[in-house]
Swiss-Prot record:
Sequence similarity: Belongs to the papillomaviridae E7 protein family.
PTM field: Highly phosphorylated.
Protein name as it appears in the record: Protein E7
Signal peptide as annotated in the record: none
Source organism of the structure: Human papillomavirus 58
Length: 98
């Protein structure tokens, strides 16, 4: 605004929307490439899918927060959950040294 009284001309912009190409240029891998990655284990069995899981719990001894990151299958995470619900506990590094 340049004057004491604003005018409509000062608020109208000269911008116009530009068309955007929404086509995805991503190329999928050939299925023959998956065989080279090693999806099959040494015994010919397919490897189970793994993922990162973050575990936040308290130290059994002092109660401080302990954070773990594991890479496992869902079945093994359930097994770990059952162990932690039982007698298996996690302690922090400072309590582990004592």
């Amino acid at each position: 605004m340049r004057g004491n009284n604003p005018t409509l001309r000062e608020y109208i912009l000269d911008l116009h929307p530009e068309p955007t190409d929404l086509f995805c240029y991503e190329q999928l891998c050939d299925s023959s490439d998956e065989d080279e990655i090693g999806l099959d284990g040494p015994d010919g069995q397919a490897q189970p899918a793994t993922a990162n899981y973050y575990i936040v719990t308290c130290c059994y001894t002092c109660g401080t927060t302990v954070r773990l990151c594991i890479n496992s299958t869902t079945t093994d995470v359930r097994t770990l959950q059952q162990l932690l619900m039982g007698t298996c506990t996690i302690v922090c590094p400072s309590c582990a040294q004592q």
